[in-house]
Regions:
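PP2C/PPM-type serine/threonine phosphatase catalytic domain
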Residues: 1-311
């Protein structure tokens, strides 16, 4: 048995006039979903606990962009479309037997692609939404593992055995420059093109989501967030706040938002935290965190391996 304890919140921050972020909590077996619905002046932490079964539990963060109400519409379209598509008839029968263990990431991938098409079409045909888009970073939990999908620069972190790992890579121009060794990570923090991302839902008709799988350990804490959090709270402080509140992660959500606002709060702030427990999970260890990169074009083939680094 595997259980997942979930806490999520979204906050307008201190500067923005509206909240263009959104989050998703989805229990597929129960056909129940939760998204950010609080008013701009409210602060609410949504908390749920589920047993993870073969149908899976999905979490996501989406950061909208586009001005006026366009960003808010884009992120809501993203989480709503993904939720609706995942609750439709199961396409598992179309997969090969070897691929059946990947049924949730296949569904999540297809739902993300469909969300992109809908956001892109809305922006193309409706002048008030022209140019709108949204990031989308999601996680799917099944007994086979934790599946991760990413479009844009909303991040996923893992806190394991008191250490923190960034398990996604920003799909951004400055990250590309870092990879090419043209700038340092420190220089990226103040780079004039810091906010330029390489892909987003709605920006183009075609997207290429990055997909991966993590083998979870007992007491792993997974964290999804928009850049309103990751730009304002260092990895070390993320780790400290999560570890200090490991027995009350709803408080960790509140403390993370408070920290981001204390450091300026110029952007909307969204965070989803999930803690895994259960007899079927490996005990936490200090080994390297291995990510299995999944080729969605040939899903049953042996996937590449990547390693997450301690931050």
């Amino acid at each position: 048995m595997v259980n997942v304890e979930i806490h999520a919140t979204s906050h307008i921050g201190r500067v923005r006039r509206g909240n263009e972020d959104n989050y998703l909590i989805l229990n597929i077996s129960r056909s129940r979903s939760w998204t950010s619905s609080q008013e701009d002046g409210e602060f609410v932490v949504e908390s749920q606990t589920f047993e993870v079964d073969g149908n899976g539990v999905v979490l996501a963060v989406s950061d909208g962009m586009g001005g006026a109400l366009a960003g808010e519409v884009a992120s809501k379209m993203a989480v709503d479309t993904v939720s609706e598509k995942l609750l439709e008839a199961d396409p598992e029968e179309t997969l090969t037997p070897e691929a059946s263990q990947y049924h949730l990431i296949a569904k999540l991938y297809n739902a993300t692609v469909e969300a992109n098409h809908l956001v892109h079409e809305q922006g193309r045909t409706d002048p008030q939404f022209q140019g709108m888009g949204a990031t989308f970073t999601g996680m799917g939990f099944t007994p086979d593992g934790v599946d991760i999908i990413q479009v844009g620069d909303s991040r996923a972190y893992l806190v394991r055995n008191g250490k923190i790992y960034q398990i996604t890579k920003d799909q951004s121009l400055v990250q590309q420059l870092i990879d090419a060794q043209q700038i340092s990570p420190e220089e990226a923090e103040t780079h004039t093109l810091k906010n330029v991302i390489l892909q987003a839902l709605g920006a183009q008709n075609e997207i290429y989501p990055v997909s991966a799988r993590l083998a979870p350990n007992s007491m792993d804490v997974l964290l999804l967030c928009s850049d309103g959090l990751s730009n304002k709270v260092t990895a070390a402080n993320l780790q400290r706040i999560v570890v200090d509140n490991i027995d009350n992660l709803a408080v960790a959500c509140a403390e993370l938002v408070k920290e981001a606002n204390t450091n300026g709060g110029e952007d909307n702030i969204t965070v989803v935290i999930a803690k895994l427990t259960g007899d079927n999970l490996e005990q936490a260890n200090t080994e390297e965190v291995q990510l299995e990169l999944i080729d969605m074009g040939n899903i049953h083939d042996t996937a590449d391996q990547d390693t997450a680094e301690v931050l």
